[in-house]
Amino acid sequence: MNFLNKRDKAAIAQRVAQDIFDGAYVNLGIGMPTAVANHLPKGIEVVLHSENGILGMGPQPATGDEDFDLINAGKQPVTLLKGGAYFHHADSFAMMRGGHIDICVLGAYQVSVKGVFANWSTGEVGAIPAVGGAMDLAVGAKETWVMMDLLTKTGQSKVVSSCTYPLTGLACVRRIYTDLCTLSCGPDGLRLVDTVEGLSHADLVNLIGLPIQPASSAGH
């Protein structure tokens, strides 16, 4: 199926940013989640954390203003907001493990209906050798949100009944933000939050191949 209205990466990031509450401490993972820093709503204060040791991270700098000594965990140039700080990697992990992060936003290869997720290996040759800080965030953050495309390049759903890749965290994902829909997940399974225009609840169930509880006011 070809969806003309599917969200690009910037639109997914904007959708995530809409749900972040005022005053939240938020970790943005490597890859797609880093774009959330560029779409935070005006008028609220959100403190962004980066695993490599930044608190008070700002959006991407303008072209020509990059400082390559100031990068996020994905090695992308960022800015530092007033009051921001750099610190040791060990201090960063103490924040992550100690329950001080309200929300972590991570990418994933698979998320199960119960909120189990896999985001570090598909078993391919040359893949990264270990899980990294995502494991610490999955355990330490108060909520884990995932950003990803809903389908693989071959059309398989990344939302699954049970993960088949090496796991990152157990029953910790609460929201799944994709190019076609937003879902909540947990002990009661999947629930629809919204979809892109033109995608019906029935179409989404057919794509994912799993039961999805309807939302009271889902966008279609």
PLM feature spans:
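N-terminal active-site beta-alpha-beta segment that forms phosphate/nucleotide-binding
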Residues: 1-81
